[in-house]
Regions:
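Flexible active-site lid/hinge loop adjacent to a nucleotide/diphosphate
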Residues: 9-122
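Walker A (P-loop) phosphate-binding motif
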Residues: 1-3, 63
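Adenine nucleotide phosphate-binding catalytic loops in nucleotide-utilizing enzymes
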Residues: 91-173
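Active-site nucleotide-sugar/metal-binding loop of Leloir-type enzymes
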Residues: 6
Length: 173
């Protein structure tokens, strides 16, 4: 971070990436004005356990005063914004690289995080990230404020809202 040895800050803001497991300690200590959550993914089961456990640990640590910026394409991440004013959602439109069928080895979101009914997916970006809905309780992908409207991984760029082109250092989503 940008601070002197005595702890005096040199900047008014910081961008910090945190491991999911550490958020229970970090969030209450930092009181972030804005919290961005990109995904909850079964990448570190040995450290963090099931994504629902990770969700619960993060949920109880989020301040009511923080503005949330959430990935609408992740059903569990979107749940952080349920019944919360001022949440900003981002995601991706249906892309040419998407699949209509599940192709991953495991699926973290077979069941709705609200009512536990089987989730319906209209498209998968990867694993459980995509466009989803629950026919039992009505939980579904939120409308987005910002969307990836085009992704060309061979050329190495994405477009946001068909207006802003971003060249990718890594040709991957």
């Amino acid at each position: 971070l940008d601070s002197s040895i005595s702890g005096k800050r040199g900047s008014d803001w910081a961008v910090i990436e945190s491991d999911e497991g550490a958020t229970k300690t970090i969030l209450p200590a930092m009181h972030p004005q804005v919290l961005v959550v990109t995904n909850l993914y079964r990448d570190q089961l040995t450290r963090n356990g099931h994504p629902m456990w990770v969700y619960s640990a993060i949920k109880e640590s989020i301040s009511d005063k923080s503005t949330l910026v959430l990935n609408a394409d992740d059903p569990l991440v979107s749940l952080f914004g349920k019944d919360r004013e001022g949440t900003v959602y981002f995601g991706a439109d249906k892309l040419s690289s998407d699949s209509d069928t599940f192709t991953s080895v495991y699926n973290d979101m077979v069941y709705c995080p609200v009512c536990s009914a089987k989730m319906d997916y209209q498209t998968y970006h990867y694993n459980h990230i995509g466009h989803y809905s629950c026919s039992k309780c009505g939980y579904k992908r939120h409308n987005t404020t910002y969307s990836v409207t085009k992704a060309d991984l061979e050329q190495g760029y994405i477009e946001i809202d068909s207006k802003l082109r971003i060249d990718l250092t890594l040709k991957s989503l």
